[in-house]
Amino acid sequence: TKPPKAGKTHAAPEEKAAPPAPEVPPTPRDATRAEKEEIVYLDLSDLHPFKDHPFGVRDDAEMKSLVESVRNGGVNQPALVRPREGGGYEIIAGHRRQMASQLAGYRNMPCIVRNMTDDEAILAMTDDNLRQRETILPSEKALSLKMQYEAIKHQGARGDSAEAGKLSLESVGQRNGMSVKTVQRYIW
């Protein structure tokens, strides 16, 4: 090998650090998510709206755009459903996708089936809609925030109910990026 030229120095080869240890995923708080969930295609006729669903499914310009998107590329995000006692499935999140699939001429759509309590279903449904929808009427927002409040209060219904109510308001505010006062204005 040639000796190094004057004025140039060679650094010792760098040692490569060992790759970091893989992170251990946190334990799911919701046991229903501990199982592997799969996307299944369910017949639209087996899907039923969530009871007391506070959000309107309107045949407006947004729906027409969604129908066109479904026609061109299918449903990109699976609906979240839970089994119904009387058969079929209750839609937790995906009412607009179901309507768009129907209007686009589809017979089925992708869904994730999850066993959920009523409170878990309410929180999943309201979270999805409050975060995803472009247009929400003030009345829809008020009703969905009230549903979240009641579900959170019900889940933590131990001890002092006034304290549980206060904590529920704070929790609803945190979930939606709102102050407690703003939440109160919507629901009372």
PLM regions with names:
Residues F55-V57, M63, Q98-W188:
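Amphipathic, charge-rich alpha-helical segments that serve as recognition/docking helices
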Residues T1-R114, A121-Q132:
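Short, charged/polar connector segments at secondary-structure boundaries
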